[in-house]
Amino acid sequence: MKMCNGSSFLASLPLLLLLLSFILASFFDTAVGQIGVCYGRNGNNLRPASEVVALYQQRNIRRMRLYDPNQETLNALRGSNIELVLDVPNPDLQRLASSQAEADTWVRNNVRNYANVTFRYISVGNEVQPSDQAASFVLPAMQNIERAVSSLGIKVSTAIDTRGISGFPPSSGTFTPEFRSFIAPVISFLSSKQSPLLVNNYPYFSYTGNMRDIRLDYTLFTAPSTVVNDGQNQYRNLFHAILDTVYASLEKAGGGSLEIVVSESGWPTAGGAATGVDNARTYVNNLIQTVKNGSPRRPGRATETYIFAMFDENSKQGPETEKFWGLFLPNLQPKYVVNFN
């Protein structure tokens, strides 16, 4: 091997450093960069958005999901380099589905006016069910919003939960007939645009809904060995089992090429069965590590995941647990230690 002299090495050093920076950036994006945190604002004791964005930056949280186009938050995100998933709230779907002009106005007011905010996805609706009045408006609203943002390179999707999916083991996953009639045209649209499907994945609810048959360690990523065998795939955690059940359902519905982004997952610290700081800490930290490596059905590729949620929300409606999903208290102090690396 020919040895280079000192001067040639020094001359090549800037190029080597540049290449190294690309390698490190790529690694960082596939590991830390896959994790975001949902910023719900249903509380009367939350701090100003500028302080919240600063907290994201201090904690190295590089992605945020925001459930409505709150102008204070969008302004605070300017120049932050935090990648944003911005929701179109369900009550707006009918209006945006009925008129391209309305969709254009929504995008102008909430996206184009914030050129120095990094928009990752627009989620058109959250957990809309086939029986909901808004169900028929999801796809046309997605189409109108997509036309309005297509020149900006922003992907458009919608977020679903797993109520419309059944089957065990994961390879038997399928959409229920009612849900399939709703989701099939959405799948076709997403496939044509190479956009991901957003899925809210909550092992907590599966566990508390069937504590007789589902083990807590399987739910918290702490099972010492395989719990579910499914052909060539083995499952040691419920999160992956749910995720792969959705993938199997997509494959049966013509959406085998789609990628799933987990748009919500977390664990409450109070208000119901199996809640508490210890379980929440275990779940969230293990989730962050687990999603780096893909699932048994889709191995080798990190799963982009958004933890629910940044703060407790004392104005949230529904069961008491709905108020206690936060990683942080309203005073910006952590409830428990989370390693976002």
From Swiss-Prot:
Main location, first listed in the record: endoplasmic reticulum
Active site annotation, chain numbering: E127 (proton donor), E264 (nucleophile)
Sorted UniProt keywords: Endoplasmic reticulum, Glycoprotein, Glycosidase, Hydrolase, Secreted, Signal
GO BP terms: carbohydrate metabolic process; response to bacterium
Superkingdom of source: Eukaryota
UniProt GO cellular component terms: apoplast; endoplasmic reticulum; secretory vesicle
Signal peptide: 1-25
Induction: By infection with a virulent strain of P.syringae pv. maculicola. Induced by infection with the biotrophic powdery mildew pathogens Golovinomyces cichoracearum and Blumeria graminis. Induced by infection with the turnip vein clearing virus (TVCV) and cucumber mosaic virus (CMV).
Primary role: May play a role in plant defense against pathogens.
Name of the featured protein: Probable glucan endo-1,3-beta-glucosidase BG3
Originating organism: Arabidopsis thaliana
Lineage of producing organism: Eukaryota, Viridiplantae, Streptophyta, Embryophyta, Tracheophyta
Gene transcribed to yield this protein: BG3
